[in-house]
Amino acid sequence: MGATSGIGRAVAEIYLRNGHQVGVCGRRTERLEEIKNKFPDNSHIATVDVTSNESISAFSRLIEEMGGMDLYIHCSGYGRQTENLDADTEMQTAATNVMGFTRFVGSAYRYFVANSRHGHIAFISSIAGTKGLGASPSYSASKRYQWIYAEALEQMARMRGHHIRLTDIRPGFVDTDFLGHGHYPLMLDVESVARSIVHAIATSKRVAVIDWRYKLLCFFWRMIPTSVWVRMPVHS
């Protein structure tokens, strides 16, 4: 999901090059057609908007067309800096990263349960969930939501004996359209990040922070008391 550009597309193309049957979903039909033309034998496409309830039916049809699903990867995301707490930005972020995330991750979980399949759900969250970021309030809060939702699903799976694994991918700044290819500290290359994601999924990591520099950063972030953090002039 969210595989028409950036990290999602890079990850999808790794699996496609390796010969896997891959269902590729996203909002931009023309980008989906590009992928289909590039990998005609093992790509299956569906135009899906995670903010729409109606898109669930397209997602379900795609799974049926493929003959089932073993791994679901959720890469859809939205976020912008909002100095003046722009209402449209905040609500669109929540609609995509909270409602859309819940809609499709939940749908994948229910699919695995209903079909008695051993399933794996992976998703791209962010190190932004580590602390509340004044430059992007809704974005950082939505990423923390994703962390906790996955934790709850993992507990549910264990309680009820569902064979479903979860992998939470937490990258830092990645050079993609999402950031407008701007200049940010510790910028990561999208292809390198995609390879790290595929490795994390293959090794069933529960949480994967990409890369070591961001692991170190998050370690120190967590040590900062909230009373100190809220006084710090942190910018995304």
Each language-model region and where it sits:
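Conserved glycine-rich cofactor-binding loop
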Residues: 4-5
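Conserved NAD(P)H cofactor-binding loop of Rossmann-fold oxidoreductase domains
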Residues: 73-81
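Active-site helix of classical SDR
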Residues: 105, 142
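Residue(s) in the substrate-gating loop at a strand-loop-helix junction
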Residues: 126
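C-terminal helical subdomain
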Residues: 168, 180-222
